[in-house]
Amino acid sequence: MKPSRILVLMHETLVPPERLAGFTSQQIEEFRTEYDVVQQLKASGHEVRCIGLGDNLSELTDVIKSWRPHIAFNLAEEFQGLVNRDQHVVSFLELMKLPYTGCNPKGLVLSRDKSLSKQLLVFNGVQTPKFFVFPKGRRIALPEGLGFPLFVKSVSDDASFGIAQASVVHDLIQLQRRVEFIHAQ
């Protein structure tokens, strides 16, 4: 395979060093994924540059225009400190006509809403556990057709954020407390 210029995008605090010497295992763990991806791409013969994304896209714009990468390897999970803005980075890559790895903007937006994602799965015949959304300000009661234990999580938090042992509830009081806790976040 012909070597490519690969631009690796990540959070600005996770840009890995060239070498791990001098770092503690705890420090390395913070940027382990980013380091491993960059090292593997280099070992495969590709030219690699890392961009740490922070609050603006000016450095990304400059590198795309001057270096002209073939593809962006997207490890960015947030933009401007917010996980619900990662789709904007991907939209920008599309506007710049730069191919990228990972999900497209529409997929990122849809996957962020767990309720909508579940509805789409059910609509398309994919078996999924029953679920219920408790709107803020409404009475919290056991939904019809569901029984304990239940797993309670935010409809919008990214990945497993907010999930804890208390997310598994065994009675109505635990359910009410956990839903109220999530609504207060």
Residue ranges of predicted features:
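ATP-binding N-terminal substructure of ATP-dependent carboxylate-amine bond-forming enzymes
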Residues: M1-P99, P105-K106, S111-R112, L116, ...
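Active-site nucleotide/adenylate-binding loops and adjacent lid/helix of ATP-dependent enzymes
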Residues: S4-M10, I64-K65, V109-Q185
